[in-house]
């Protein structure tokens, strides 16, 4: 109705709270609510700077809490199933096996994996050198299993005609160039389906699984942060949420009081 309209100067904190409640009632997603509130706050900041208003009714306005979306994680058995279904009789079989072992063993980003060089591997020391975001380098421990698979792959790699400029790249395509990110996604999708795993698995899933399994095994969060190449510990802390979910499931599954008595 006409008499319900208000000028911008007349709108109060309570009016805005009512508006947000209406957004919630009509089913607007919390993320969309947060964007709307952010827009309103920006508008009122502009009015305040322009001296059109003297009080900002949005000052105490809070955005809705948005639930943390936990990344997909594979179990150890699922990882093993994916690796075990790789057909080593195929020309690219050993490459794929070594590649996925390294991905899981070291928790690499897909760009770090495709850019990995033969000269980045230090088998005696048990480390690989990784170039992460912003060209920052870090040393990451590599498992004996992954090193063995790389050694096996190198026999096949020697039969590939390598294009100029890619001589030091570890994981090569059939054309003798570095594997593309899309190709790595495709290989993982193919192997996940072959293993009968019905999850949305990507290269990043292996990275998430690496971090989660370390945390479940009792690894220090700072050590995981270092291995993942996270600048901030808060980025790594998402895995504590996954670990809590793992613990919750373990309790529900194994604790004698977790199920109602019949």
Language model: regions and residue ranges:
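Conserved catalytic core of the tyrosine transesterase superfamily
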Residues: 1-262
